[in-house]
């Protein structure tokens, strides 16, 4: 809104919105979005700062105060651009977070703008001073404005609610919440003031309001506030006028929006304030108003003084308030009573009860001498209070001091102590005040209840907000529970609106119901077995205390609900007993006094006096209270309530809250959140921490959180294109037309931003949070670049202009200089001098001629001037006239514009009316269809009823007999019900016993698990338990010494007591008793010590067993170490031999190169080499023999792997024999064919290929052998597993059979009970069938009536057809008229366009446009008048609605066309005005054309008149048609009245019949439900038993599988070890490679151990889940002996797994460090066992930690074993590759031998063959060298194979990650099982509740059966009446048809 529009708000404008100047200044303020930020602050929550630097996740910033702070990067929050300063709707902030919201509120509050929107919220801050924003001028300015059209205000919220109610036909509500002192009451008053002012402008008379003795309804609604505030408001620390109750005010409106009535509901009145106030607070205002002495007659009537300090109940705090004038407030309260219609008697009663409460507080009592009973200490105040209450003073005192109490069936008088009497007085005073306040509310509602018709309402909820105090009690729980429900309601509503916005805009969005976020907390409070339920249950038990209530809360919710927590008590604060996690924060609650507060007990003797009071008001207040004797019968029969007195406070609050939520769910809500800025009541000061606390509590930040989930920023396409086109102008070209949406899409797609951060709707573009700020930053950067460029170009242009001027000056100076120099050169010439003299003479003659010419010219100019002056005057006159005409035309255009605006508004209203009518038409059609269906049903039922009418008369006698039988059966069923209740009570007791047994079994099971874990801990807790046990032993020794000292002290005390025996006998007795007790304690201690000693001896024996096992393991380890040493030495030897061989090969190659020299030397060297080679071969054979010896020794130890290795050796030998045969063949070929050496080489190459293939085949055979061996091992393990499983399952089968026998016995008893109940239900069903038969006969009569009604409806349809024909004729006339008018107006438009082209002048165009607009306006007015008439017809006639709807759409199109044409004419007007300015000089020439145009205009006016005459004729014809319509309408109205009467009568009869039928059906359904529920409950019990059995079996199976896994892993480890020992021979040759593999394996082992640490947490969670599953075993396990047996088995399993774990770790790590560590751990365990004389309680606490560590170690061992198996497989693969390489090496060695042999032969041949042969040998040597290189390449390939194995290890790590995922899946499965367990528990609870409800329903049904007969008689009489009435109506209808 502009400043001119804001002027409508008057003086309030500056307090509502920033001016345009301020907005411009804010937008031009320098701002850097990258550095401006908020940082957290200890005092101020957040402060503004500028970022100085960033490094390492830390940000250094400088605050506004100059302070430098360093914070984490995620704690820094960006500031919003200046565009968003003091923004009205905080949801539009681009950076929407806590500091942005806080500072926006703070800056607006500093400018006194106290109202701010936050999405759906309106946040208001208390200004603590008067602001001119509520006067009548502001009310008028806000009326009818949309929320976006006006500044934020409570009036805007109110008006929107009012407008929504009128347009949407939906009830509205305004929810105002906040802390005390935040301004809730003031805003509530303003809302009511607004509604009273805008909705009551019409009729202010009192004729429709008979209850209004004084004042109108509006006055009464406004005056209800002062009356309620006097009795419900009080001064508190924060607020002088704090409402101490919540209220929901419903203001009802009629169909037109006028006030109709109002009513008020109140919640949670603070009763305790009546008798107690804090120092800085005071009681309710009414007490001090009475004592203000403004009305002395009141003081005399109430027998009080004017000094508040005379009365204890009202003087505990302050007695006066500076801001409140109690005397004036008394007059306002009294006048409010008068306006609200209170009688004098009612006013006096209210005042008397208020005075009596003050006297109550002054009553004194004292204790009787030598008794604890109380007696009155003076009766003056008691007499006064009794007089004012209309009681007898003596009876009152007697009732207080000696109330009557019922004991059994008799009443006894009970004596009260002084404290009990004072408590009783306080409770009575509070109860009287509360009931009086509730009566006032009821009385005010009766006054505000008028007889005016009401259709909709607007509810205003004023209730306390969320409360988190240091001390939170029952009241805070109720308030916070209420706010939790309201916040859930808001969350759900808010996101529903967001979703509707997204759906309307066509944005894809997945629905999220944020309303469910708070469901867990709400369920915790209100659901069965919730906090409220447990509180009410405890109130039922006489011996219940606050601590038992706390224990039940802990048992049911601690650890089971995340919202229920154990509080952390802080020193200096009051104790808290439990904590609840609400949406606004965690609240600690103190439960002291909750049971008394909830029960709110009263002295029933005094209440009985109240009921008999002579004061009418007092007797009325307590008339509904049921005392003990009145409620006795209800108790005995188990009724629902013990009257109203037994209804607890929590139950009443829940009931009221459910009603409120039901009301709110039927309304469209609006939310107002009030904020208190500071606690000092200082205006303009805002305390940041206080405000942040409230924003969290009242849901503003919660609302922002929800808003941020979607797209909080949204801009219209046009606005976005206009503002951000500058970012990329090329995306939207200037010259061509592009739709705004397409332009926005192109623009955003061209920018470098995340496309998921925005969405395109139908009319708007939606942005995620923060993106708009990024766009603003990009726009600012773009603008700065553009402005910089413009500035540069402008400066350049200016400088170029200046430079051009300088150049021109220089050129001019040069010309002047040249001319002066030329003149100076010729001025002394004689001819020049002569020229100077003659020149003036020549000029004088010329001047004379010029003067004559000038005189002539002057005369001519003078004449022309005179003519021009005359012409100018004429033109001026014409200009004045034209200007006048122009102004007139402008005024006319403005008037036409206003008229057009009015027409548009009326058109909008018509469109709205059309929509409403369409809705009504739909409703009427639906109603018509329903009525037709009902009519059909009624006619059919009518026929049936006529047929059955005769049968009914016969059945009446039968019914009387059946009724007598039913009465007998009723008595029988009552007896059965009693028996059933007794049986149910017995069942409840059985269930309670079962639950106790269940708990006992759970505890026993838990104890057994603890024992099991303790036993496991004794093995696995190493260093930690050692230290702790040593400390415990020291503590025990210290405690033993202390016990000895205590014993010595006691003996000394005993001797001293014996010496003092003569002093006093009483002290001796006491001391002897003490001595006896101490001796008993000592005996107990000694007994405990002996027990612990026996336990220690057992533990020592166990430790000895463990020590033996450790020694065996150590011996085994030593053997393995010796074997390892032997392997290492063998490997060292082989490595040495290999190095020697390689060295020798190198020497051979060198010698072969030198073979070209002397052959004799070479022969000698060859011989030496051969000798050395022989020696090396012998050494190698010896080494192989040694290795074979060691391998044989190992094979003897491990017989399983001998066969496998033997087969492998056989295969290798076969391959070797083949190779040797081939070698011999090669030798023969070499001897035979020495000349063909090349062919031999080729043959050799081929044979080598063959050998390689054979070797591959051999490898394949070996792999197959390994697989078969592996499968054989698997079969053996499976066999062992199946044997163990069979044994275990046999044992479990025996246990389960015993268990099943127990369950079957229980099931038989339950089935017997169920059969009894079934028999009872069948008897009841027979009675029901008899009644159902009677009901069917009544239905037959009803069907006959419905047939009659159908005939009436057919007649009605006939009339409607006649009416529709008339309406169709009207529609034809209207369409004819509209088409003619459209054609004529189009002709006018064409003619005026031709006129405009001919005139080409602005004034003519203006006149043409004006004429056009006037004609359009006239025709439009006529059409609108006709439309209004037709709309009235439409409202009267439902049948013609469809036709009128089509015509209305046509009219809308025509109106849109005219509107478009008018806009075109406006554009033509603007263009013509521009032309008028440029062509004003040509007006004179165009005068003739103007006159011709006037003639044309007159012709068009004549045509217009003809058209108007035709229109008038048509309107007359329409008027005649309308008369006919009116006559038909009258007939239709009469018929409708008769139809409505008949329909209402039929509906009443049908309703009564349906009601009776429903009652009987409900009774039958309830009986069936009871039967089904009992059967379902029994089935569920059976299912629970079966489920528990299955769970137990599942747990046993899981234990068995874990045991099998352990055995498999152990066998696998042993098998791997055997294979490793068997493969040692092959690994000896490749020792270096094996060492490298071993080092890599160690690295992978370390990685696996690190991975084990990572997965340890997940395994812990899985173990916890397993523990939860194990608890289910306790449901079916009845004996502790079974658990002990399982304990023994599990111990054995643990010992086995422990041994396997140690073996696996020892085999994997392969170092002696682990052995030494285990040795030290075992020795420490031996020491620990000796010192296990610890206290049992301390030992149990430490056992839990140790058990956890044991589980971790066990899981770690399992993981390590599996990793070891995987690593062993990998190692086996590497060993296979190394074996392959070894075989290749052997082959190479064999080829070397062959080559050596050939070399020897070659040398011999060389001796014979000479140099040629030597050259051949050299060539052969070169080929061998090439082969050697090839072998080296193969070696490199083997290295590559090793790298592949490394990649395989990486794949194994990936498999471990998959194992992690499997663990996660297991965890999910465990969670699901836990949820199922909880669901089963919940079902059991619901079954118990259902049983209780079924019993109550059973009792209800009996009562309803008694009422069924009476209702059947009533229905029959109504049917007879309806028959007579329908006959009369049929006769009337026939008469009407004949007329």
From Swiss-Prot:
Residues 657-679, 759-773 are annotated as: Actin-binding. Pfam families: Myosin_head (PF00063), Myosin_N (PF02736), Myosin_tail_1 (PF01576). InterPro entries: Kinesin_motor_dom_sf, Myosin_head_motor_dom-like, Myosin_N, Myosin_S1_N, Myosin_tail, P-loop_NTPase, XRCC4-like_C. ATP binds at residues 178-185. The modification Phosphothreonine is found at residues 379, 1277, 1284, 1311, 1515, 1681. Residues 842-1939 form a coiled coil. Residues 1908-1939 are annotated as: Disordered. Residues 783-812 form the IQ domain. GO terms for cellular component: myofibril; myosin filament; myosin II complex. It is found in: Cytoplasm, Myofibril. The modification Phosphotyrosine is found at residues 1261, 1310. Residues 32-81 form the Myosin N-terminal SH3-like domain. Residues 1925-1939 have a biased composition (Basic and acidic residues). SUPFAM superfamilies: Myosin rod fragments, P-loop containing nucleoside triphosphate hydrolases, Tropomyosin. Keywords: Actin-binding, ATP-binding, Calmodulin-binding, Coiled coil, Cytoplasm, Methylation, Motor protein, Muscle protein, Myosin, Nucleotide-binding, Phosphoprotein, Thick filament. The modification Phosphoserine is found at residues 417, 1090, 1139, 1271, 1309, 1512. Muscle contraction. Belongs to the TRAFAC class myosin-kinesin ATPase superfamily. Myosin family. The rodlike tail sequence is highly repetitive, showing cycles of a 28-residue repeat pattern composed of 4 heptapeptides, characteristic for alpha-helical coiled coils. Limited proteolysis of myosin heavy chain produces 1 light meromyosin (LMM) and 1 heavy meromyosin (HMM). HMM can be further cleaved into 2 globular subfragments (S1) and 1 rod-shaped subfragment (S2). Muscle myosin is a hexameric protein that consists of 2 heavy chain subunits (MHC), 2 alkali light chain subunits (MLC) and 2 regulatory light chain subunits (MLC-2). This is Myosin-6. It comes from Mesocricetus auratus (Golden hamster).
